């Protein structure tokens, strides 16, 4: 619907705006909480309206690298459950997780769907297996989600319409043999540490 709103959190992957606005909906952006890049819940709650249909979140985040904590996700889920009751309709979380494995120093990346039933999980192998541009991944639609049949049908329909992003059959076969194998992120971690230390040495302040 023209008045539908999707909320996301700054900083965010720029194409989110294209995805949302191409449907005629509006992207609403919660300003960044720069001291730790967790969610500014006061700002978030001010932006929620009866037109809010979904929240797009990305953890580990592109471009900040921040990982939303379990406490952050629990609070987000609690607020959205209250708003679902108040507004009388589902508010989905679209959890975009292409960087799930790329977390360092023992950081745990919580599974959002563990805390909130109305969660769609979008995963891509482009980062974990270094396959950018190959358009191979999946969307998890839990049985518990509101309007399951309608949501599942809409996603399946989108895959048929957007033929330029359909998963190539060759990569589907290849990934079936690779799924579940650990990703070697040592090079990413080393490069990240070098960049971080370089910025600190140059006088910058960085959140880590």
Predicted regions and their residues:
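Conserved PLP-anchoring active-site segment centered on the Schiff-base-forming lysine
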Residues: 1-19
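Short, intrinsically disordered, charge-balanced linker/junction segments flanking boundaries
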Residues: 1-3, 49-50, 194-208
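Short beta->alpha connector loops at strand-helix junctions that form conserved
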Residues: 10, 29-34
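A short helix-loop-beta submotif of the ANL/AMP-binding
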Residues: 21-27
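Active-site phosphate-binding strand-loop segment of PLP-dependent enzymes
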Residues: 34-107
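Conserved core segment of the aminotransferase class I/II
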Residues: 117-189, 193-204
């Amino acid at each position: 619907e023209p008045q539908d709103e999707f909320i996301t959190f700054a900083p965010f992957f720029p194409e989110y705006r294209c995805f949302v606005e191409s449907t005629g909906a509006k992207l609403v952006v919660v300003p960044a909480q720069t001291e730790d890049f967790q969610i500014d819940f006061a700002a978030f709650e001010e932006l929620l309206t009866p037109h809010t249909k979904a929240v797009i979140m990305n953890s580990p985040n592109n471009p900040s690298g921040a990982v939303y904590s379990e406490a952050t996700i629990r609070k987000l889920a609690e607020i959205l459950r209250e708003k679902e009751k108040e507004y009388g309709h589902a508010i989905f979380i679209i959890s975009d997780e292409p960087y799930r494995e790329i977390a360092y120093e023992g950081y745990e990346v919580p599974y959002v769907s563990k805390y909130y039933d109305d969660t769609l999980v979008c995963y891509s192998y482009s980062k974990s297996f270094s396959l950018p541009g190959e358009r191979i991944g999946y969307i998890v639609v839990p049985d518990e989600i509101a309007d399951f049949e309608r949501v599942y049908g809409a996603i399946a329909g989108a895959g048929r319409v957007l033929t330029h992003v359909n998963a190539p059959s060759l990569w589907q076969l290849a990934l079936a043999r690779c799924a579940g194998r650990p990703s070697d992120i040592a090079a990413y971690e080393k490069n990240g540490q070098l960049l971080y230390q370089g910025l600190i040495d140059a006088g910058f302040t960085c959140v880590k």
